[in-house]
Amino acid sequence: MLFDAFTNGFMNDIFEFGDRSKFNRSAWLSCWGPALELRETEDTIEVDVEVPGIDKQNLKVDLHGSKLTISGERKKPEEEKAGPLIRWSERCVGAFSRTITLPQPVDEKLIHASLNNGILSIVMKKKNPEFTTRIVEIQ
């Protein structure tokens, strides 16, 4: 049956262990987007994103409400384009995008981003919560 042929091939690929596995977990996951770390201090929310080999001109940071999006592109090295045939590669090239929901509102005017040694660091000042008092009439 067609389904059996598909599942047998698929299962063989999944359980093919070793260096040539098509489902090498660490290589597969790394292509989804760069790893990041989110920290929260009393006054700030800080995000570090691992983007080695990507120039700041190829990175973009957007804030839409409580959603922070980091996007960019890792270009293929020039020597690979005209070089020998690559038989195996776990390097990820191309566009990526990561969106996270911030745990608290931030002041969109007080955001700082810097790139140093392949780490994109984003520091955002938390908004001061505005507390109001209101007496609610019971109906």
Curated annotation (Swiss-Prot):
Keywords: Mitochondrion, Stress response
Cellular localization per UniProt: Mitochondrion
Domain of life: Eukaryota
Major localisation: mitochondrion
One MF annotation (Gene Ontology) recorded for this entry: protein folding chaperone
Residue stretches making up the sHSP domain: 27-139
Record-linked Pfam families: HSP20
GO cellular component: mitochondrion
Any one biological process term the GO annotation gives: chaperone-mediated protein folding
PANTHER family for the chain: HEAT-SHOCK PROTEIN 20 FAMILY MEMBER
Similarity section: Belongs to the small heat shock protein (HSP20) family.
Descriptive protein name: Heat shock protein homolog C338.06c
